[in-house]
Amino acid sequence: MCGIVGIVGHSQVAPLIVDALKRLEYRGYDSAGVATIEHGELARRRAEGKLINLERRLKEEPLDGTIGIGHTRWATHGVPNETNAHPHFSDGVAIVHNGIIENFAELRDELVRDGYAFSSQTDTEVVAHLVARELAKGLKPVEAAHQALKRLEGAFALAIMFKGDEDLIVGARNGPPLAVGHGDGEMFLGSDAIALAPFTNSITYLEDGDWAVVRRDSVAIFDIDGKKVERKRQQSLSTSFMVDKGNRRHFMEKEIHEQPEVISHTLAHYVDFVSGVSKPLDLPFDFAKIGRLAISACGTAYLAGLIGKYWFERYARLPVDIDVASEFRYREMPLSANDAAFFISQSGETADTLASLRYCRKAGMKIGAVVNVRESTMARESDVVLPTLAGPEIGVASTKAFTCQLSVLASLAVRAGVARGVISQEQEKTLVRALSEAPRYANQVLKLEEQIERIARELSRYKDVLYLGRDTNFPLAMEGALKLKEISYIHAEGYAAGELKHGPIALIDENMPVIVIAPHDRIFEKTVSNMQEVAARGGKIILITDSKGAAQVSVKTMETIILPDVPEIISPIIYALPIQMLAYFAAVFMGTDVDQPRNLAKSVTVE
């Protein structure tokens, strides 16, 4: 969601802050701003919309100063406009904030009674006034910030700057991530390491309840009680990646085309392609001894987990409980310390997923984090990190992270099957061999781009689309619908094909394209029956299948996308690509902001 950057430097910082904020655009935002200290006074520039608007403003009205804070805002309290954009000021205090102050209404009423006037609708301005009130009592800036922090409830990350002090930024974290970057005679704050990549790869991650006093040549970190604490300084892996589109129009397009490579990297971490066996993993539990596996995630990661459920139950006979993270911890389901739980998140910072992780931690369960950022909060709070080696994913709509999550889960399901005695050594080799073929098949699918683009052009003319699938293709149908609606804004729904007659069939007519995901498998004929029901009502069928399915289907289709004949275990990985490409090209034809669709954020760090 919101992105935070702070720099205590030795040259003009405003352009550097904007550059760092660009690296946080993937998180989603609707306004942006920068504040510096010019000649001892606070100065700021803010703009609604994209960073290019802020850049224009800074070109017209440059900001001097060697210290500054910047922010990209994703609206929670108050509409997206310049007035609500950060940084917010109050009597010599400048602040940027990510998260939600849950007791903001109570604090606002208290501050109004004390004579403080509010110029915005945000909860952030409450914090600025709280700090200013403590300064007015005679406290020094650091202590004023500390006292204000003790009044806050909720999930937040903050960066605070003070008029007249060009060698101080106070940062604080309680939920959303915040990192300190160590430079040579300069220091940095950022929502993640990617923002700080141009400046440093030496990072200290704040933990929940931490607040930091950041100066040019030092950082001191304290807990909420003011006790000094030590946090590990580490080299960030994220800084090794350049964030650019290459020769592609959008990050999403680039990331779709990176999938053969990153799937290969991810699989190679978990299986040995040469010997045909799963690689040993230092897991905190034994697959053979647990009675159940819990999985929780949000959005696309949840759908990856749902496919993982099929795999674990099929290949390892391991029962899986799965739910979206926002519901998981409210179900009051029985949890056992003898079982394990996997939590899936690209960023490793998803608030609901992190809350579910902590819920299972309290129950004594062993925790695995399937994440794309090894330094993330979820990774640090888990017993084992199960990395997806996708590299930074900038497009808000997940593509390569999704297929890498599937690659991890498929590999783990094979390992679990071996450990539980369900899979023989020969079967393991067959499955690992199948997994090793996934990158090659993914490359073949990408060569269908011209056909898929043509189909997407036709698809973009409709207002509603239905996706159908059975077995692992049911979650894929939901993923296809999610992709289409989140970036093209075309209404779409994904259903289990067998549920068609239980409601969705009422919507079928000549204005309803139906995308059917149906490789030629043991239930192919059942899906064909559902296609016949659609055809009988005038629905326009787009079939995604393989050569066997295309040869045997008896129903007339509007279009048929023929994929390679692939082994069952990698089918969801390979069939994910055409649904991503359909959504991408449909969005291009609709003229939407593909990489940063409206109202969405890449990293959802509030519940």
From Swiss-Prot:
Residues 2-217 form the Glutamine amidotransferase type-2 domain. InterPro entries: GATase_2_dom (IPR017932), GFAT (IPR005855), GFAT_N (IPR047084), GlmS/AgaS_SIS (IPR035466), GlmS/FrlB_SIS (IPR035490), Ntn_hydrolases_N (IPR029055), SIS_dom (IPR001347), SIS_dom_sf (IPR046348). It is found in: Cytoplasm. Its main location: cytoplasm. It is an enzyme of class 2 (transferase). GO terms for molecular function: carbohydrate derivative binding; glutamine-fructose-6-phosphate transaminase (isomerizing) activity. GO terms for cellular component: cytosol. It catalyses: D-fructose 6-phosphate + L-glutamine = D-glucosamine 6-phosphate + L-glutamate. The keyword Signal does not apply. Residues 283-422, 455-597 form the SIS domain. Keywords: Aminotransferase, Cytoplasm, Glutamine amidotransferase, Repeat, Transferase. The keyword Repeat applies. GO terms for biological process: carbohydrate metabolic process; fructose 6-phosphate metabolic process; protein N-linked glycosylation; UDP-N-acetylglucosamine metabolic process. SUPFAM superfamilies: N-terminal nucleophile aminohydrolases (Ntn hydrolases), SIS domain. Its EC number is 2.6.1.16. PROSITE patterns: GATASE_TYPE_2, SIS. The active site is at C2, K602. Catalyzes the first step in hexosamine metabolism, converting fructose-6P into glucosamine-6P using glutamine as a nitrogen source. Homodimer. This is Glutamine--fructose-6-phosphate aminotransferase [isomerizing]. It comes from Mesorhizobium japonicum (strain LMG 29417 / CECT 9101 / MAFF 303099) (Mesorhizobium loti (strain MAFF 303099)).
